[in-house]
């Protein structure tokens, strides 16, 4: 499985990590810089905390950040 780690930068996931994810949230600079974004591979879909959005998928490079487009 390959997952995006950043804008148009993907990497093959380590063994046992079969889920791609995008984690987004706002911090104090959200109004000027936009959402904070973490992308990558995981063994299971991370648990979202209040104010954090997480999207998971399980096909190659499926974790596209919607505001960047494809």
Curated annotation (Swiss-Prot):
What is one term from the GO cellular component aspect held by the record? extracellular region
SUPFAM superfamilies documented for this protein = Snake toxin-like
Q: Which body tissues produce this protein? A: Expressed by the venom gland.
Disulphide connectivity of cysteines: 3-20, 13-41, 26-30, 45-56, 57-62
The Serine amide modification is found at 70
Q: Which domain of life is it from?
A: Eukaryota
Q: What is this protein called?
A: Alpha-elapitoxin-Ast2a
UniProt cross-references to InterPro entries, sorted A to Z: Snake_3FTx, Snake_toxin-like_sf, Snake_toxin_con_site, Toxin_cobra-type
Q: Which keywords, in A-to-Z order, does the entry hold?
A: Acetylcholine receptor inhibiting toxin, Amidation, Disulfide bond, Ion channel impairing toxin, Neurotoxin, Postsynaptic neurotoxin, Secreted, Toxin
